[in-house]
Structures are given as structure tokens and as C-alpha cells.
UniProtKB/Swiss-Prot annotation:
InterPro entries recorded: PARPBP
Name of the protein in its database record: PCNA-interacting partner
Region named Disordered: 485-552
Keyword field: Cytoplasm, DNA damage, DNA repair, DNA-binding, Nucleus
Purpose: Required to suppress inappropriate homologous recombination, thereby playing a central role DNA repair and in the maintenance of genomic stability.
Organism listed in the record: Xenopus laevis
Domain of life: Eukaryota
Subcellular location field: Cytoplasm; Nucleus
Family: Belongs to the PARI family.
Gene Ontology CC entries for this record: chromatin; cytoplasm; nucleus
Length: 567
């Protein structure tokens, strides 16, 4: 053939014909040249992240690794070729991505057919496949080029969004055929807007790795468990998927709605038309008829519908002529689930042919537009693959964000208020918190002002001729701190002779001890018991002086009786 594109398509058709020999699943999807490049970009970024770097990769590194990967898998790499750094890990991650998505790339299909010993593989050599994947290939003479008219506002918008809308339609169809394809799910998870952004995709990705399931099966099982499982089987409240319950429910129910079309519609033409119409109406819901996105979605749906009908007509012509080369169809008289599960089998085969034709397309010429998608400009809420898979992974040992760590340190230094600042009448029974103590030091009362933090014992000179002024000062201090002392008792103490110097010294020592005790308990509220003890101790110390005065003390009413009898 003149064009490698037709050879690649012929190779894929033979793979579908002999799939029981070369593949494990009939619904294995094929990864085209563009998807191979996107998968390699994700593998490179994942390896960089495992090596302690960011989840990112430069465009030049992707293109250099891409050329070496294609040559190495085809066995055309020279010995003196420079091997990219960490190539073994990159290839392992690349193959793991494809395996988890139940997909095969074009090189894998070529190797499987060559290993099977089929003569069909000789129609396309490894050098031709290398040129097809790495270089700009020649197009056949009959290839139709899109004719673009003079740019206007509506036409320019339609031309820009058409390729993106086509990928969205094909991703939905790919997910219906192959439920394990995580790349197809990533393109349509939030398209249209369902509130399932990067955070939701990250939570789904982590859960799928823990359960060793595809992302779509994780979302489906989560919704089914909530709807049908009951309280005993419901997910825990700490499940990270619970906060995305509404969006996941909308997504799963829409896929269920598309799957119902397979079972209810037996004609593949009608089923394909209904599928495309349902996807289109779901995308343009809420938009006017003159909206550029609505017009572009309508055109893309019509083009895909025509291609599906064309493929069905080709199969009908081949069956009528009997030149298909495919084994005859088994009789359906005793087929299990006739009209239900097997009703959409022809539709699935038609969709697989449509997806295979897209996989056989040559790679995009502008690699920068393909790999470096605009993160801010999202159509219908759909993010690029690299943006979704770049979401940070949080584990138990992963450090938190810097803002969270700074806020935690600030909150740790702040004193916590345990009790209300308005103190009740029972405040003396509470233990003051650090904040209350700080407030007391900022605004102390007159009875709590300390002279110093560690007061030394006061040296009071005791002289007989200078005792009276010292007693006056002492009495003033006692009057301020103890209001329950009788004034008469204070006057008696003041008029005592100088011979009671020992008692006065003991009083001064007691006052000093009391002051030290007060300084040690300044944070405690003043208690009346201390005043009572001070008064009783003073009375005990003055017992000797009161014995003399008690001899002349009269009983109540004794003075009146004495004056009466004297008369």
C-alpha cells in the first residue's frame, strides 16, 4: 500500500479477527500514537516524582524518550544510542499504565501478531511503523483535507473546540466498551461540570490503588454500596469519596443510562444514534441553539453518526458477498440472555471499529499543543490528563502544606481560654489558667502588687525611744491589709510600754512571714481566713499584757451597779 496509515489499520483489523489468540479480552482497546505520547509523558512525570522531584517533565525530555522508546520496543535501537536517564523505570511505568487500562499500543499489537507467526505482519515492516510513529507520514491522494472558510467569530470558535469535543465523545464511547480505561474516564469525569475536579480524581485514584481496581469500578461500587447496601454495608463516614457523593452519583447514573441503550436497542444504527444524541444533549444542556459549543457538538455528533452507519454498511456488504474471511456467526437459537445482555453485542463491535480507526490515525504534527494543554482554559469542565494526574498524593507521612504548618505553630503559642473571664462568686475554688494569670499581671489589684519577685526579709531596727514611729507605720500597714481588727485593740497596742519589745519583734516577724506568704500566693484571691488567723495570733502573743489589764476590766453593767450602791 502507498500509505502506512492503511497498513496500520489493516494490522488492527487482523488483531480483532484473531483476538482469542493474541489477547486476553475482546474489549481491549488500542492506544494510538497521540495517546502513546500522552501515556509516556505521565510515566516520565511519575518516575520524576518517585525520585523526589515534582510531578512534571519538560517537552524536550518527552520527545527524546519517545524516539528511543519506539526504537527500543521495535528492536531498532543502535548500540551507541544514548539511553535516557531512568529508562528502565520509565518503560516499566509506561507498560503498567497500559496494563491497568486494559489497553495495548500499536507496537504491542505488531509484536503479538509477529509472535503468532501470521503473514499479515509482513505487510508492515518495523521500519515503516517507526516512520509512522516518529515522522510526518505521507497521506494518500484520496485523503480529504478540511476546508476552513474565512475566519469569523462563530467559525473560529467552532474550529477550536471541535477536536476537543471529538475526544470527549470518543472517550465516552471508549468507557462504554472498556470500563477499565482510566484515561478515558479522566477526560469525561467532570464533563460536563459535576464538581469532580482534581481533588475528586485524586481520591478516586488513591482508592483504586488500594483496592487494585479501575477508577470507574471504584466509583460504581461506591455508589452501589450506598444505594443498595444499607446501613450495615455503607462506607464509613471518614471515606474520602463521601464528599464527592453528588458528583459521582450523577456520573454513574449517566453511564448507566448509556448502558441501558445497549440492552434495549437491538439495531446498531439506532443504538449508535441514540448514544451520540444522549451524549450531545448532556453536554449542551442549558445552552442556547446559537451557542458555538452547541453547534460544534451537533456537528461532531453528526459526523460520528455517519461514520458508524458507514461501518455498519461495510459489514453488511461483506456478509452478503461472503468475502469477509471471518468465521460464520454462531446460531442464536439457544443463546443465553438473548435480547438482553447479547442484544448490544453488534453495537459494541461497531464502536470498537470506530475506535480502531481513530487509533490508526497518524500522530499530531504539533506536539506542543498536544502535551502542553492550557490548564486554565477547560472546555465543559474537562481537564487535561497531565493536570489531573499531577494532583498531589497525601499519605500519613507526607508533610502538610506550609500555610497549615505555620498556622498550627501560631495556634500552639496562643494561650487557650478554659474559663470565662467573668468570674463568679465561687472563683476562689477555680484554678486560674495561663491567660487569667497573664491578665492579673497586666492589671494587678492593690492587694496583689508584689514589691519584688523574691522579697528578702526586712531588717527592722528596734529601739525603745524610736519604737513609737515604727509602730505607727506598722499599724497603718495592718489597717490597709486587715480591716477586721478592732480599733480599740489597735489603740491598746499603741499605748503599751517599751518593755514588750519581744512581743513586738514577734509581731514584726509574723507580719514579715505573712507578707512572704502573700507574695507567694499573689495569684490566689484574698481569703478572710488569713485575716482571722492574724487576729488570733496577735491575741495569743499579747496574752501576757492582757493579764494585767484584765484585772481592772469590769463586767457589762458592773459600773452602773457600783455607782448605784455608792449613792
Amino acid at each position: 500500500m502507498d500509505c502506512p496509515h492503511q497498513d496500520v489499520l489493516h494490522l488492527i483489523k487482523y488483531f480483532r479477527k484473531e483476538w482469542p489468540v493474541v489477547s486476553d479480552s475482546e474489549r481491549t482497546t488500542i492506544c494510538g500514537a497521540d495517546n502513546m505520547l500522552l501515556t509516556l509523558q505521565l510515566a516520565l512525570a511519575e518516575v520524576n516524582k518517585q525520585n523526589g522531584k515534582e510531578f512534571s517533565v519538560s517537552l524536550s525530555d518527552v520527545l527524546l524518550t519517545w524516539k528511543y522508546l519506539v526504537k527500543h520496543k521495535l528492536g531498532l535501537a543502535c548500540e551507541d544510542t544514548v539511553v535516557p536517564k531512568d529508562y528502565a523505570d520509565i518503560q516499566k511505568t509506561y507498560d503498567l499504565f497500559l496494563k491497568n487500562s486494559n489497553s495495548l499500543d500499536l507496537i504491542d499489537i505488531y509484536e503479538k501478531i509477529s509472535t503468532a507467526g501470521s503473514s499479515e505482519a509482513h505487510f508492515l515492516s518495523s521500519e515503516q511503523l517507526l516512520d509512522f510513529l516518529t515522522n510526518d507520514v505521507c497521506l494518500s491522494e484520496g485523503t480529504d483535507f478540511p476546508i476552513v472558510s474565512t475566519p469569523c467569530k462563530n467559525n473560529l470558535d467552532t474550529v477550536k473546540v471541535k477536536p476537543t469535543l471529538k475526544r470527549i465523545f470518543l472517550a465516552y464511547l471508549n468507557l462504554l466498551v472498556n470500563a477499565k480505561n482510566d484515561f478515558a474516564l479522566a477526560q469525561v469525569l467532570n464533563c460536563p461540570e459535576r464538581g469532580l475536579g482534581r481533588e475528586a480524581f485524586t481520591d478516586l485514584k488513591h482508592t483504586s490503588r488500594l483496592k487494585n481496581m479501575s477508577i470507574f469500578l471504584v466509583a460504581t461500587s461506591f455508589i452501589r454500596t450506598i444505594e443498595l447496601g444499607g446501613k450495615g454495608y455503607a462506607p464509613s463516614e471518614s471515606d474520602p469519596l463521601r464528599k464527592h457523593l453528588k458528583g459521582l452519583s450523577l456520573f454513574v447514573h449517566f453511564i448507566d443510562r448509556l448502558n441501558e441503550i445497549f440492552g434495549e436497542t437491538h439495531d446498531p444504527r439506532t443504538a449508535g444514534e441514540l448514544l451520540l444524541s444522549t451524549i450531545k444533549m448532556h453536554l449542551i444542556k442549558g445552552r442556547g441553539s446559537g451557542d458555538p459549543l452547541s453547534e460544534a457538538a451537533t456537528e461532531v455528533a453528526q459526523d460520528l453518526d455517519l461514520r458508524i452507519k458507514y461501518l455498519i454498511n461495510l459489514v453488511s456488504e461483506d456478509k452478503s458477498s461472503g468475502t469477509t474471511g471471518i468465521s460464520p456467526v454462531r446460531p442464536k437459537i439457544r443463546a443465553i440472555n438473548r435480547g438482553t445482555a447479547s442484544g448490544g453485542r453488534e453495537t459494541i463491535k461497531t464502536l470498537l471499529k470506530l475506535l480502531d480507526e481513530e487509533a490508526a490515525n497518524p500522530p499530531s504534527k504539533n506536539k506542543a499543543d498536544l502535551l502542553c494543554a492550557d490548564e486554565e482554559n477547560t472546555l465543559f469542565g474537562a481537564f487535561s490528563l497531565f493536570t489531573l494526574f499531577r494532583s498531589p498524593e497525601q499519605t500519613g507521612s507526607s508533610p502538610k502544606a506550609l500555610s497549615q504548618r505555620v498556622q498550627k505553630a501560631i495556634n500552639k503559642d496562643k494561650p487557650k481560654l478554659k474559663h470565662n473571664l467573668i468570674r463568679s462568686q465561687f472563683a476562689c475554688t477555680y484554678k486560674d489558667s495561663n491567660l487569667t494569670q497573664t491578665k492579673q499581671w497586666d492589671f494587678p489589684s492593690m492587694s496583689q502588687v508584689p514589691s519584688c519577685i523574691h522579697p528578702a526579709p526586712k531588717i527592722v531596727p528596734v529601739l525603745c525611744f524610736d519604737e513609737e514611729p515604727l509602730e505607727n507605720d506598722l499599724q497603718k500597714g495592718l489597717k490597709q491589709s486587715s480591716g477586721n481588727i478592732d480599733l480599740k485593740t489597735a489603740e491598746q497596742v499603741k499605748n503599751k510600754p517599751c518593755k514588750n519589745v519581744g512581743n513586738k519583734r514577734s509581731k514584726r516577724k509574723q507580719v514579715d512571714i505573712q507578707s512572704e506568704t502573700t507574695n507567694g500566693q499573689e495569684n490566689e484571691p484574698p481569703q478572710k481566713k488569713a485575716v482571722v488567723e492574724l487576729t488570733s495570733s496577735k491575741a495569743n502573743k499579747q496574752g501576757v499584757s492582757r493579764n494585767k489589764a484584765s484585772k481592772n476590766k469590769l463586767i457589762t453593767g458592773q459600773a452602773k451597779l457600783t455607782s448605784f450602791f455608792r449613792v
